[in-house]
Amino acid sequence: MDFEASARDLTTPVKGAKIVPNMSVDELVREYAGCAFGAGRLAEAVDIYYEMLASEKTTKFFGLAGAMTPAGMRGIIADLIRDGHIDVLVTTGANMVHDTVEALGLHHYKGSDCANDIQLRHECIDRIYDVYLPDQHFTDLEEFLQSVYAGLPQEKLSIRQVLTEIGKNLDDDSSILKTAAEMGVPVYCPALQDSVIGLQAWLYKEGNLLHVDAFADMHEFMEICYEAESAGAMLLGGGVPKNYILQSMLVTPKSFDYAIQLTMDRPETGGLSGATLDEAQSWGKVGEDAKSVTVYADATITLPLIVSAVRTRLSKR
């Protein structure tokens, strides 16, 4: 961000978007580039993400927070992994829970945010805003997880290794965990305990041998950061995934060269999820000359647009 900009810098007029029939998403985004506010930021995010993915020397980190998998974003992320556009994924446990639910053929359903939640409770239906999930799905998920844990090696494992083993037991090409396991892309989940996957691991451990070292992934993750010639981060939401990605670079002499944040959170409360990427520069997490932008909008809207536009540009290289 240029804090020295002033009213004297009247060099770039706002250009209204021109919408014509049969436009591609990339053509629409290019029209956004002449606009201000969120439209201009979205166009900037596409430019940065394209440069980040096109760079062969850049290690690409992806932070996944929020309820992205129940909302229908898992296939997009699985495709990004499959196409080599994600080198490292850091996620919440909940996103991997819902990814596994779908991979087992246990669907989420479109519902209503105006539902009678007491009635839903009586009908054994859980609500995630306007998404419904039957309680029975969790019973089926728990049985699957217990069978996976029973087949794990009886040695010290990292959380990443546990998630890889879960992915190996799934058969769904839209699954994030399955695709990551197939492609050899590490999936890190620093707060796995805060999910059904973690809860079921604890329940299994109560009566069986299971040794998961919560710190084991850090050495591996730091090595990736050290070895990165250049680093870029796409951050959906904030929370643990965002901080885990950004703080790890502090251990190295480097900073992130590219950073994109898709969030609805505000910076005024001081929470990490709303903290700006400019603020991250004060910590040395994002480089002084980094290309970065925060897009304040629902990531279920912005992520598909960004990925679609960037894919079009990459196909024309």
Curated annotation (Swiss-Prot):
One of its GO terms (biological process) is spermidine metabolic process. GO terms for cellular component: cytoplasm. Keywords: Hypusine biosynthesis, NAD, Transferase. It holds the Pfam family DS. It catalyses: [eIF5A protein]-L-lysine + spermidine = [eIF5A protein]-deoxyhypusine + propane-1,3-diamine. Its EC number is 2.5.1.46. GO terms for molecular function: deoxyhypusine synthase activity. The keyword Zinc-finger does not apply. Coiled coil: none annotated. It is an enzyme of class 2 (transferase). Pathway: Protein modification; eIF5A hypusination. The active site is at K285 (nucleophile). HAMAP family: DHS. PANTHER family: DEOXYHYPUSINE SYNTHASE (PTHR11703), DEOXYHYPUSINE SYNTHASE-LIKE PROTEIN (PTHR11703:SF2). Belongs to the deoxyhypusine synthase family. Catalyzes the NAD-dependent oxidative cleavage of spermidine and the subsequent transfer of the butylamine moiety of spermidine to the epsilon-amino group of a specific lysine residue of the eIF-5A precursor protein to form the intermediate deoxyhypusine residue. This is Probable deoxyhypusine synthase 1.
